[in-house]
Structures are given as C-alpha cells and as structure tokens.
Amino acid sequence: MSEPLRVAVLQGGRSLERAVSLRSGAQVRDGLGRLGHTAIPIDAGGELVGELIAAQPDVAFIALHGRHGEDGTIQEVLEALQIPYTGSGPAACVRATDKVLAKHLMRAAGIPTPPFFALHDHVVKQLGGADALPSIEERLGFPMVVKPAHGGSALGVKFARQGSELPGAMVGAFSYDVRLLLERHIA
C-alpha cells in the first residue's frame, strides 16, 4: 500500500440534501479508515475554508450533495486552495447539475432525451405562464415528470398522470427550486 493520506471528507453542508451527505460522509470515512488513511470530517459550513487550511489535507473527498457540493462551488474553492479533490471539475459540475442545460447539451450532442419544457416560477406566477400548460400538456402528454431544475436525490420529483395533478406537482417542484423541468415520462 502507498503512504497513508490525510483526506478531508467534506460532508453535510447547508443544502436540502444535508442528511444524505452526512450518511455518505460516514460511509466514506469508514472506508478510508479500513484502507489505513486518516479521514478528517469537515462539515461544510461557515468556517469551511479555515477548516480546510487548518487540516492541511493531501486530498479532499467530496461527499456533499446538492447546491454548493455538486454544482462546482466547492470544486472552485478547492482549486483556489490547491487541494486535489475527487470528482469532476467546476465546469462539468455546472453542466451536470443544471438539468435543463444538461438536456440541451445532450440534444446538441445527438444523445436522445425525452421531450421537455422548462418554466421559471416568475413566468408562472407573474407572467401568466400557467396559460401555456395546455400547450405543454398536448406536446408532452401524460404521464409527465415534473422536477426541480437543480438538485438531486429525487427531491421534489413528482409524476403527473393527468392534467389535474400537474399544478400540485409543479408546486412541489417549485418548493425546491425557482425553475422546473416538465418532461415526458418514458416507461
């Protein structure tokens, strides 16, 4: 085995996926310990940068989920501190965590993806966007998947099997993000 590493395990944070992240962090720490490495748990809160500097890790293992963990934010901080880390770089994270952008990139690359529409809550609440729903329903059909444009762990994902279920599904998705994705369900 190579020399043991000091690994900062970044976990928790302030996203809606905090609980998932804490469980992931515990599993990572256990695995690193079994491999003979020193795991340094760091809850990604208000003192994160100072804690990273003080810990002087050889590498950071990103066990964060959701905003600021998977969206390129923490990766940019680690790069600024010159701390190597697990996972993708900031640009790839930004592309992957924005579901609407990711779908546009897939289409541009010729990768099949179900038909979709994106709506911002401002459009729905203040610009009469709800009037576009019959057209969207006609073009996507039912069942339809309604999900926040950002985030993971299936938080806020709802299925609308018919038109009467769509408003409730949208309210649920909007409780997680200001933008949502309406997508044809593929069985």
Regions found by a protein language model. Give the residues of each.
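ATP-binding N-terminal substructure of ATP-dependent carboxylate-amine bond-forming enzymes
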Residues: 1-108, 120-134
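Glycine-rich phosphate-binding loop of ATP-grasp-fold ATP-dependent ligases
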Residues: 21, 114-118, 143-169
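Hydrophobic beta-strand scaffold residues
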Residues: 39, 84-85, 113, 144, ...
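Basic phosphate/pyrophosphate-binding loop/patch that engages nucleotide-derived ligands
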Residues: 105-113, 172
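Glycine-rich beta-alpha junction loops
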Residues: 123, 150-152, 186-187
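Acidic/histidine-enriched active-site and ligand-binding environments that engage anionic O-linkages
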Residues: 133-144
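Phosphate-binding site of ATP-dependent enzymes
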Residues: 158-187
